[in-house]
């Protein structure tokens, strides 16, 4: 059942949110469009891990990294967005667990992972293990 986050009790949103966004553009209009979701989750949940993709790379491609997006998004939300440039899920879990409430993380381009485009269930499980809830605001 699909639920809208503004229709869910705030206590249900406590914890870490895995937020799927779509940054697959050359400008920032999609970032602007998702600011209300990010701000709502910051109030309601403890931490946010943002996941997204860009392009169709065959492995790592520096030009398609989301590193610059973390800087731009930091300016938009008025707080640091921690960029995570690796996909070592145990390290990511530790980093998020050690961070204070209100922290925002941005994982690098999910398309750098072979399993992203083929909807690998194991990758889905690894991503899901990072958070308490999943919020999709990719459009």
For the regions a language model picked out, list residue spans one by one.
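Active-site loop-to-helix "anion-binding N-cap" substructures in soluble metabolic enzymes
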Residues: 1-139
């Amino acid at each position: 059942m699909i639920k809208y986050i503004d229709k869910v009790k705030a206590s249900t949103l406590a914890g870490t949110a895995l937020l799927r966004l779509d940054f697959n553009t050359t400008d920032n209009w999609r970032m602007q469009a998702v600011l209300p979701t990010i701000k709502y989750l910051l109030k309601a949940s403890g931490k946010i891990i943002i996941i997204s993709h860009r392009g169709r790379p065959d492995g790592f491609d520096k030009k398609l990294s989301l590193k610059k997006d973390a800087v731009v998004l930091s300016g938009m939300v008025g707080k640091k967005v921690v960029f995570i440039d690796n996909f070592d899920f145990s390290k990511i879990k530790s980093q998020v667990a050690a961070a204070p409430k209100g922290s925002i993380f941005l994982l690098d381009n999910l398309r750098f992972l072979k399993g992203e485009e083929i909807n690998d269930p194991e990758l889905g499980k690894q991503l899901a293990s990072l958070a308490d809830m999943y919020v999709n605001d990719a459009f």
